[in-house]
Regions:
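Hydrophobic alpha-helical transmembrane segments of membrane proteins
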Residues: 1-23, 41-165
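Short helix-to-coil transition segments within interhelical loops
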Residues: 29-35
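Alpha-helix N-cap/helix-start motif at helix boundaries, enriched for small hydrophobics
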Residues: 37-39
């Protein structure tokens, strides 16, 4: 599930690598479209690929439940896996796009690895923080609240990075 959401998000980022080979990076500067519209299209493409990954992950979960029953310990496990996948993807996109425009296309792969590791680290850090804030046997409501906090932080970083880029 995580691989579907994160993997499909990587598709939109990987497509930026091909810009220099196709000379699009030079051509887009001469078009009558504003730079902000081009940047917003990258963010929108990223979100669309994330949604495609979520759909594939949802289909995978549904098929798994239909064929094997419910393989998770708690009802919230699927929710948390989706929150982690979406959170890592949004953090990754929120970090990658500003780095890409600051550093240029030459270091695209390096920025991709950095943003992926930062996304994973931020989700793990938030999870650790939430585990220390809530008492040890977490209730279902606390788990859902923790997931909502992770999602809200990831979405905030992603939304803030769009105008910054």
């Amino acid at each position: 599930m995580l691989l579907a959401m994160i993997g499909f998000s990587l598709i939109s980022i990987a497509s930026l690598r091909k810009e220099s080979a196709t000379k699009w990076s030079k051509y887009k500067l001469t078009t009558p479209v504003k730079r902000s519209a081009i940047v917003q299209s990258y963010f929108l493409s990223f979100l669309l690929w994330l949604i495609v990954g979520m759909v594939f992950a949802g289909i995978g979960v549904a098929l798994s439940i239909m064929l094997h029953g419910f393989p998770f310990d708690k009802d919230t496990d699927v929710f948390l896996l989706f929150v982690m996948g979406i959170g890592i993807s949004l953090f990754m996109g929120g970090i990658f796009f500003p780095l890409f425009y600051i550093g240029g296309e030459e270091r695209n792969e390096v920025f991709l690895v950095i943003s992926l590791l930062c996304g994973i680290g931020l989700v793990m850090g938030l999870t650790t923080l939430l585990n220390t804030l809530f008492p040890a046997p977490m209730t279902t409501m606390q788990i859902i609240l923790g997931g909502a906090i992770i999602f809200a932080c990831a979405l905030l970083i992603f939304v803030i990075s769009c105008p910054v880029t």
